[in-house]
Amino acid sequence: MDYDVIVIGAGPGGYVAAIRAAQLGKKTAIIDKQWMGGVCLNVGCIPSKSLLKNADVAHTLLKRGKELGFSFDNLNLDFSVAVKRSRQVSNRLVKGIGFLMKKNGIDVHMGVAKLVAKDTVEVTAEDGTMISLQAKDIIVATGASAMVPPVWEVDGEKVLTYLEAITQEKLPESVVIIGSGAIGVEFATVWNSYGVDVTIVEMLPRIVPMEDEEVSAELTKALKKRKIKMLTGHKVEAIETVEDAGVKITISAGDEEKILEAEQALVAIGFRPNSQKTGLEDVGVQIDERGFVSIDEKMATNVPGIWAIGDVTGKLMLAHVGSAMGILAAIGYTARRP
């Protein structure tokens, strides 16, 4: 099947790029192996903000209810309902993406994509069937996945990434969150609001270390007020799951070691690019030492006709940044091609 443009990845970068390409008169296809809307809409920014809204209401009722005029004898906080609501919010928006694809005449192919030539993509569906798509231009928007050191085993029950944490309906009694970026701090806030004993472990000297120091200072005050424990300047040496119990986490600071015990551990130390097994290197696309796709200011890779946007490039890993990059990529190849 021949197209003007093929977009690999249907997250906020990919689907926006596909829409813009179609609006510019290009015959467009989009491929995703799992979800329309990508991580953001399905298991990332959207459901997490839904949970944060529930958490904000729960925290307000518990801590300031009487002050604000709410009286109750038996307040019941059902976290499973909060999670179900977050799934409903997510699913509604994902359906909206499907509508936008149809409205703009974009062909959707669900399956695993692999570049087999600089103008050809093979798509393998879940049932094993394979199709071959060709295009003048290909936009790579494959995103990123949770980074987990090989020695840490994520079992989805005691040791989690955001992927398992965002959908679990049962609250742990206690949790150690490894990493204090946006994901770690968001889950700390949500779980703490529902009464979970939360400890954040951060290797660097302050929480949200990629933000300005003023942001870290204010957020530290806010989390301390909520009685969320923070251990900065501590490195996680080992995570051990305990049979019929939870986890033991060995942390160190200088020459001192100590063990934290909790029902669960959440690994939130960053992301790795989804660039492996994509065929990018096979067709000559330059990948840096960390696995990110190298691009110029127009989102072009070193291979003419192949573009890359969003998290897989290692730029600012934010949904709206990916969307803006998608529009730039569309403008770039449209200006170059008749």
Mark where each language-model region is.
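N-terminal Rossmann-like FAD-binding beta1-loop-alpha1 element of flavoenzymes
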Residues: 3-30, 184-193
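Glycine-rich flavin
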Residues: 2-3, 19-26, 31-171, 199, ...
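FAD-site-proximal beta/loop scaffold in flavoenzymes
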Residues: 155-171, 259-337
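Hydrophobic/aromatic ligand-binding patch that stacks against planar heteroaromatic rings
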Residues: 16, 20-21, 40, 138, ...
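Conserved phosphate-binding and hydrolysis motifs of nucleotide-dependent enzymes
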Residues: 9-14, 143, 179-184, 270, ...
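Short hydrophobic core segments
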Residues: 6-8, 113, 133-143, 178, ...
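Rossmann-like dinucleotide/phosphate-binding beta-alpha-beta segment
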Residues: 177, 182-203
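Short glycine/serine/threonine-rich phosphate/pyrophosphate-binding segments
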Residues: 12-17, 39, 159, 184-187, ...
